[in-house]
Amino acid sequence: MDEAGVAGWVTSDELAEAGRFVREGRRREYLTWRAVVRRELGADVRIAYDAAGAPVVDRDGVYVGVSHCRGRVAVCLSDVPCAVDIEPETRDFSRAAPRYMSPSELALSGDPLLPAAVWCAKEALYKYARRPG
């Protein structure tokens, strides 16, 4: 979503906060996920963070999960706790995979996308549990 797309969906405080990010891509990701949440829940929704750093909204019974990476964002909204993680298909996990995948997980498939899928699944579980990943 470009700046025109987020206009009207983000607050002046959020624009100021985004202005502090060094990378333009990170700035866009930050503003985009907030605009998506407000587009779905209403322009007046307040977005904050809980003690674990997870996003929360001021709507009873509404949970939000967010991930952003390399210019893309994913947002999940649910009536139960939720979490999401995304990574680009082009990211090479081959060297890191043995640190977060068990030998039996590594043996499951020769699919080169499996390490990315496992990474995202485990990262989403850490987010869901409100634990640092």
Where are these regions (language model features)?
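Core catalytic alpha/beta fold that binds nucleotide/phospho-ligands
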Residues: M1-G133
